[in-house]
Amino acid sequence: MLPTMMTYIEEEPTALETILREHRHSLAAIEAFARERPVQRLLLLATGSSFNAALCARDLFERRYGLRVEIKEPYNFVHYETVDPHTDLVIAVSQSGKSASTLAAMEKVQAAGLPVFALTSDPQSPIGKVSDYVLDINTGIEQVGFVTRGFSATVLNLLLIALTLARAQKQIADEEAQATLHQLSQLAAVIPQAIAQTEAFFDRHQATLQSGTRFVAIGYGALTGVAKEFETKFTETVRVPSSGFELEAYMHGPYLEANAQHVMFFIEDAPDRRLRALRDYMASAVNQTFLVTLSEAQDPQTLALNFPLEHDLASLLLIVPMQVLAWRTACAKGIDLSVRIFDDFDRVLKSKI
Protein backbone atom coordinates (compact mmCIF):
# COMPACT_ATOMS: atom_id res chain seq x y z
CA MET A 1 0.00 0.00 0.00
CA LEU A 2 1.38 3.40 -0.98
CA PRO A 3 2.13 5.82 1.87
CA THR A 4 -0.05 8.89 2.31
CA MET A 5 0.55 12.24 3.95
CA MET A 6 -1.04 10.81 7.10
CA THR A 7 1.35 7.85 7.03
CA TYR A 8 4.27 10.23 7.45
CA ILE A 9 2.54 12.30 10.14
CA GLU A 10 2.04 9.12 12.17
CA GLU A 11 5.74 8.26 11.74
CA GLU A 12 6.88 11.53 13.31
CA PRO A 13 7.29 10.29 16.92
CA THR A 14 9.63 7.47 15.87
CA ALA A 15 11.49 9.69 13.41
CA LEU A 16 12.06 12.44 15.97
CA GLU A 17 13.25 9.97 18.60
CA THR A 18 15.77 8.56 16.12
CA ILE A 19 17.06 12.06 15.38
CA LEU A 20 17.39 12.81 19.09
CA ARG A 21 19.19 9.55 19.75
CA GLU A 22 21.66 9.97 16.88
CA HIS A 23 22.13 13.74 16.73
CA ARG A 24 25.64 13.77 18.23
CA HIS A 25 26.76 11.65 15.29
CA SER A 26 24.69 13.30 12.53
CA LEU A 27 25.68 16.81 13.65
CA ALA A 28 29.30 15.98 14.49
CA ALA A 29 30.64 18.16 11.65
CA ILE A 30 28.98 21.31 12.94
CA GLU A 31 30.08 20.60 16.51
CA ALA A 32 33.69 20.20 15.35
CA PHE A 33 33.43 23.42 13.34
CA ALA A 34 32.20 25.39 16.37
CA ARG A 35 34.97 24.02 18.58
CA GLU A 36 37.60 25.40 16.19
CA ARG A 37 36.25 28.94 15.70
CA PRO A 38 33.64 31.22 17.29
CA VAL A 39 30.15 31.13 15.81
CA GLN A 40 27.84 34.02 16.66
CA ARG A 41 26.26 35.04 13.33
CA LEU A 42 24.49 32.50 11.13
CA LEU A 43 22.90 32.71 7.71
CA LEU A 44 20.17 30.20 6.85
CA LEU A 45 19.31 29.81 3.16
CA ALA A 46 15.87 28.29 2.74
CA THR A 47 12.67 28.52 0.74
CA GLY A 48 9.18 27.02 1.02
CA SER A 49 8.68 24.67 3.97
CA SER A 50 12.39 24.87 4.77
CA PHE A 51 12.00 28.64 5.28
CA ASN A 52 9.03 28.01 7.58
CA ALA A 53 11.08 25.48 9.56
CA ALA A 54 13.82 28.07 10.00
CA LEU A 55 11.26 30.55 11.35
CA CYS A 56 10.11 27.92 13.86
CA ALA A 57 13.66 27.33 15.12
CA ARG A 58 15.18 30.83 15.11
CA ASP A 59 13.89 31.79 18.55
CA LEU A 60 15.99 29.09 20.25
CA PHE A 61 19.16 30.30 18.53
CA GLU A 62 18.59 33.95 19.36
CA ARG A 63 16.73 34.33 22.63
CA ARG A 64 18.06 31.33 24.52
CA TYR A 65 21.60 31.05 23.17
CA GLY A 66 22.35 34.55 21.88
CA LEU A 67 23.21 33.40 18.34
CA ARG A 68 22.17 35.86 15.65
CA VAL A 69 20.31 34.25 12.74
CA GLU A 70 19.40 35.72 9.36
CA ILE A 71 17.04 33.73 7.14
CA LYS A 72 17.24 34.49 3.44
CA GLU A 73 15.13 33.39 0.48
CA PRO A 74 17.79 32.04 -1.91
CA TYR A 75 16.56 33.55 -5.19
CA ASN A 76 16.28 37.06 -3.77
CA PHE A 77 19.62 36.65 -2.00
CA VAL A 78 21.39 35.63 -5.21
CA HIS A 79 20.02 38.42 -7.39
CA TYR A 80 19.39 41.36 -5.07
CA GLU A 81 21.42 41.04 -1.86
CA THR A 82 25.04 40.91 -0.73
CA VAL A 83 27.00 38.50 1.44
CA ASP A 84 27.59 39.80 4.97
CA PRO A 85 31.34 39.36 5.53
CA HIS A 86 30.75 39.05 9.29
CA THR A 87 28.80 35.80 8.86
CA ASP A 88 30.41 32.94 10.78
CA LEU A 89 28.36 30.00 9.53
CA VAL A 90 26.02 29.33 6.59
CA ILE A 91 23.44 26.54 6.51
CA ALA A 92 21.53 25.75 3.32
CA VAL A 93 18.29 23.97 4.20
CA SER A 94 16.66 21.79 1.53
CA GLN A 95 14.84 18.57 2.32
CA SER A 96 15.08 17.26 -1.23
CA GLY A 97 18.50 18.78 -1.87
CA LYS A 98 17.33 19.75 -5.36
CA SER A 99 16.32 23.41 -5.01
CA ALA A 100 17.96 25.29 -7.87
CA SER A 101 17.77 28.66 -6.11
CA THR A 102 19.30 27.28 -2.92
CA LEU A 103 22.14 25.75 -4.91
CA ALA A 104 22.83 29.10 -6.60
CA ALA A 105 22.82 30.85 -3.22
CA MET A 106 25.33 28.34 -1.85
CA GLU A 107 27.66 28.98 -4.77
CA LYS A 108 27.44 32.74 -4.17
CA VAL A 109 28.38 32.30 -0.51
CA GLN A 110 31.22 29.91 -1.33
CA ALA A 111 32.59 32.37 -3.88
CA ALA A 112 32.82 34.89 -1.04
CA GLY A 113 34.99 32.46 0.91
CA LEU A 114 32.40 31.20 3.39
CA PRO A 115 31.95 27.45 3.98
CA VAL A 116 28.43 26.08 3.66
CA PHE A 117 26.70 23.30 5.58
CA ALA A 118 23.81 21.58 3.80
CA LEU A 119 20.93 20.26 5.93
CA THR A 120 19.13 17.78 3.69
CA SER A 121 17.29 14.46 3.65
CA ASP A 122 19.47 13.31 0.75
CA PRO A 123 23.23 13.70 1.33
CA GLN A 124 23.84 12.50 -2.25
CA SER A 125 21.65 15.24 -3.74
CA PRO A 126 23.11 18.11 -5.79
CA ILE A 127 23.07 20.40 -2.74
CA GLY A 128 24.65 17.72 -0.56
CA LYS A 129 27.45 17.20 -3.06
CA VAL A 130 28.22 20.90 -3.54
CA SER A 131 28.26 21.73 0.18
CA ASP A 132 31.44 21.89 2.23
CA TYR A 133 29.78 19.86 5.00
CA VAL A 134 26.61 17.82 4.76
CA LEU A 135 24.19 17.26 7.66
CA ASP A 136 21.68 14.43 7.19
CA ILE A 137 18.16 15.25 8.39
CA ASN A 138 18.07 11.53 9.12
CA THR A 139 14.56 10.60 7.98
CA GLY A 140 15.04 9.59 4.36
CA ILE A 141 12.98 10.89 1.45
CA GLU A 142 9.19 11.14 1.71
CA GLN A 143 7.32 9.68 -1.25
CA VAL A 144 4.53 12.24 -0.82
CA GLY A 145 5.15 15.74 -2.13
CA PHE A 146 3.46 17.48 0.80
CA VAL A 147 6.18 17.05 3.40
CA THR A 148 5.17 16.57 7.03
CA ARG A 149 7.60 14.17 8.71
CA GLY A 150 10.44 15.89 6.89
CA PHE A 151 9.25 19.32 8.00
CA SER A 152 9.13 18.35 11.67
CA ALA A 153 12.49 16.61 11.32
CA THR A 154 13.98 19.78 9.82
CA VAL A 155 12.69 21.88 12.72
CA LEU A 156 14.11 19.41 15.24
CA ASN A 157 17.50 19.32 13.50
CA LEU A 158 17.68 23.11 13.53
CA LEU A 159 16.82 23.17 17.24
CA LEU A 160 19.54 20.59 17.85
CA ILE A 161 22.03 22.61 15.79
CA ALA A 162 21.35 25.58 18.08
CA LEU A 163 21.91 23.39 21.14
CA THR A 164 25.03 21.84 19.60
CA LEU A 165 26.57 25.24 18.87
CA ALA A 166 25.83 26.47 22.39
CA ARG A 167 27.28 23.31 23.92
CA ALA A 168 30.39 23.31 21.71
CA GLN A 169 31.11 26.93 22.67
CA LYS A 170 30.47 26.22 26.36
CA GLN A 171 27.56 28.64 26.52
CA ILE A 172 25.49 26.08 28.40
CA ALA A 173 26.25 23.40 30.95
CA ASP A 174 25.73 19.77 30.03
CA GLU A 175 22.88 19.58 32.54
CA GLU A 176 20.97 22.28 30.66
CA ALA A 177 21.56 20.52 27.35
CA GLN A 178 20.30 17.23 28.78
CA ALA A 179 17.20 18.93 30.20
CA THR A 180 16.35 20.34 26.77
CA LEU A 181 16.89 16.97 25.11
CA HIS A 182 14.60 15.38 27.69
CA GLN A 183 11.89 17.95 26.93
CA LEU A 184 12.19 17.23 23.23
CA SER A 185 11.94 13.50 23.85
CA GLN A 186 8.79 14.01 25.93
CA LEU A 187 7.39 16.18 23.16
CA ALA A 188 7.95 13.45 20.57
CA ALA A 189 6.21 10.94 22.83
CA VAL A 190 2.97 12.98 23.03
CA ILE A 191 2.58 13.43 19.26
CA PRO A 192 0.22 10.39 18.97
CA GLN A 193 -1.99 12.04 21.60
CA ALA A 194 -1.89 15.34 19.67
CA ILE A 195 -2.90 13.50 16.49
CA ALA A 196 -5.86 11.86 18.27
CA GLN A 197 -6.96 15.19 19.78
CA THR A 198 -6.81 16.83 16.36
CA GLU A 199 -8.79 14.01 14.74
CA ALA A 200 -11.53 14.47 17.36
CA PHE A 201 -11.45 18.24 16.82
CA PHE A 202 -11.84 17.78 13.07
CA ASP A 203 -14.76 15.41 13.55
CA ARG A 204 -16.53 18.07 15.67
CA HIS A 205 -15.97 20.79 13.08
CA GLN A 206 -15.95 18.85 9.81
CA ALA A 207 -18.85 20.77 8.30
CA THR A 208 -17.12 24.12 8.83
CA LEU A 209 -13.75 22.94 7.53
CA GLN A 210 -15.17 20.98 4.59
CA SER A 211 -17.15 23.98 3.35
CA GLY A 212 -14.39 26.52 4.06
CA THR A 213 -13.29 28.67 1.12
CA ARG A 214 -10.73 30.92 2.87
CA PHE A 215 -8.40 29.91 5.72
CA VAL A 216 -6.16 32.13 7.85
CA ALA A 217 -3.73 31.20 10.63
CA ILE A 218 -2.11 33.65 13.03
CA GLY A 219 0.90 33.07 15.30
CA TYR A 220 3.66 35.05 17.01
CA GLY A 221 7.34 34.58 17.74
CA ALA A 222 8.42 31.06 16.82
CA LEU A 223 4.77 30.23 16.10
CA THR A 224 4.85 32.53 13.09
CA GLY A 225 6.65 29.63 11.42
CA VAL A 226 3.72 27.35 12.31
CA ALA A 227 1.27 29.84 10.79
CA LYS A 228 3.37 30.07 7.62
CA GLU A 229 3.59 26.29 7.33
CA PHE A 230 -0.20 26.17 7.79
CA GLU A 231 -0.36 28.49 4.77
CA THR A 232 1.93 26.22 2.78
CA LYS A 233 0.18 22.95 3.67
CA PHE A 234 -3.38 24.21 3.23
CA THR A 235 -2.47 25.86 -0.07
CA GLU A 236 -0.82 22.65 -1.33
CA THR A 237 -3.52 20.25 -0.20
CA VAL A 238 -6.85 22.01 0.43
CA ARG A 239 -6.26 24.24 -2.62
CA VAL A 240 -8.30 27.24 -1.61
CA PRO A 241 -6.86 30.64 -0.61
CA SER A 242 -4.94 30.15 2.66
CA SER A 243 -2.63 32.51 4.54
CA GLY A 244 -0.44 32.55 7.63
CA PHE A 245 0.38 35.80 9.42
CA GLU A 246 2.47 37.07 12.31
CA LEU A 247 0.05 38.45 14.91
CA GLU A 248 1.00 42.12 14.71
CA ALA A 249 1.38 42.05 10.92
CA TYR A 250 -2.22 40.83 10.58
CA MET A 251 -3.39 43.86 12.53
CA HIS A 252 -1.77 46.23 10.04
CA GLY A 253 -4.02 45.76 7.05
CA PRO A 254 -4.82 42.09 6.37
CA TYR A 255 -7.73 42.10 8.85
CA LEU A 256 -9.61 44.35 6.43
CA GLU A 257 -10.07 41.37 4.11
CA ALA A 258 -12.11 39.42 6.69
CA ASN A 259 -15.63 38.36 5.79
CA ALA A 260 -18.23 35.75 6.66
CA GLN A 261 -16.47 33.05 4.59
CA HIS A 262 -13.23 33.13 6.57
CA VAL A 263 -12.17 30.32 8.91
CA MET A 264 -9.42 31.49 11.26
CA PHE A 265 -6.93 29.63 13.46
CA PHE A 266 -5.17 31.41 16.33
CA ILE A 267 -2.04 29.58 17.49
CA GLU A 268 -0.51 30.00 20.96
CA ASP A 269 1.76 28.11 23.31
CA ALA A 270 0.46 29.65 26.55
CA PRO A 271 -2.56 31.95 26.96
CA ASP A 272 -1.71 35.13 25.06
CA ARG A 273 -3.82 38.17 25.87
CA ARG A 274 -3.24 40.00 22.58
CA LEU A 275 -3.89 36.95 20.40
CA ARG A 276 -7.09 36.17 22.29
CA ALA A 277 -8.25 39.78 22.09
CA LEU A 278 -7.86 39.63 18.32
CA ARG A 279 -9.74 36.34 18.19
CA ASP A 280 -12.61 37.82 20.20
CA TYR A 281 -12.73 40.88 17.97
CA MET A 282 -12.75 38.89 14.72
CA ALA A 283 -15.33 36.33 15.87
CA SER A 284 -18.36 38.35 14.75
CA ALA A 285 -16.84 39.17 11.35
CA VAL A 286 -15.90 35.69 10.12
CA ASN A 287 -17.40 32.21 9.78
CA GLN A 288 -15.40 30.66 12.64
CA THR A 289 -12.45 31.42 14.91
CA PHE A 290 -10.55 28.45 16.36
CA LEU A 291 -7.84 28.52 19.01
CA VAL A 292 -5.00 25.97 19.00
CA THR A 293 -3.12 26.00 22.29
CA LEU A 294 -0.76 23.96 24.46
CA SER A 295 -2.74 24.91 27.56
CA GLU A 296 -5.98 23.45 28.94
CA ALA A 297 -9.41 24.55 27.74
CA GLN A 298 -12.98 23.27 27.67
CA ASP A 299 -14.21 25.56 24.87
CA PRO A 300 -15.43 23.39 21.94
CA GLN A 301 -13.88 25.88 19.49
CA THR A 302 -10.46 25.30 21.06
CA LEU A 303 -8.02 22.51 20.26
CA ALA A 304 -6.21 22.24 23.60
CA LEU A 305 -3.21 19.90 23.59
CA ASN A 306 -2.65 20.32 27.35
CA PHE A 307 1.13 19.90 27.16
CA PRO A 308 2.97 23.06 28.27
CA LEU A 309 6.32 23.78 26.60
CA GLU A 310 8.75 26.64 26.50
CA HIS A 311 7.95 28.97 23.63
CA ASP A 312 11.13 28.20 21.69
CA LEU A 313 10.26 24.48 21.52
CA ALA A 314 6.48 24.79 21.10
CA SER A 315 6.40 24.95 17.30
CA LEU A 316 7.55 21.34 17.04
CA LEU A 317 4.33 20.14 18.68
CA LEU A 318 1.93 22.80 17.43
CA ILE A 319 2.72 22.02 13.80
CA VAL A 320 1.19 18.54 14.16
CA PRO A 321 -2.46 19.72 14.32
CA MET A 322 -1.89 21.92 11.26
CA GLN A 323 -0.62 18.92 9.30
CA VAL A 324 -3.50 16.66 10.36
CA LEU A 325 -6.10 19.34 9.64
CA ALA A 326 -4.68 19.91 6.16
CA TRP A 327 -4.91 16.18 5.40
CA ARG A 328 -8.39 15.71 6.84
CA THR A 329 -9.79 18.86 5.22
CA ALA A 330 -8.41 17.92 1.80
CA CYS A 331 -9.89 14.43 2.09
CA ALA A 332 -13.25 15.83 3.23
CA LYS A 333 -13.32 18.07 0.16
CA GLY A 334 -12.77 15.02 -2.04
CA ILE A 335 -9.25 15.96 -3.14
CA ASP A 336 -7.19 12.90 -4.07
CA LEU A 337 -3.67 13.89 -3.05
CA SER A 338 -2.21 10.79 -4.69
CA VAL A 339 -2.99 12.29 -8.10
CA ARG A 340 -0.14 14.55 -9.17
CA ILE A 341 -0.99 17.93 -10.68
CA PHE A 342 1.26 20.35 -12.58
CA ASP A 343 3.55 17.38 -13.12
CA ASP A 344 5.82 19.27 -15.52
CA PHE A 345 6.17 22.37 -13.31
CA ASP A 346 9.72 21.78 -12.05
CA ARG A 347 10.93 20.80 -15.51
CA VAL A 348 9.46 23.81 -17.27
CA LEU A 349 10.30 26.39 -14.59
CA LYS A 350 13.62 24.75 -13.63
CA SER A 351 12.86 25.29 -9.94
CA LYS A 352 14.39 21.94 -9.01
CA ILE A 353 17.35 20.06 -10.38
Where are these regions (language model features)?
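Active-site phosphate/pyrophosphate-binding segments
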Residues: L2-V39, Y133-L135, I141-H262, G334-I353
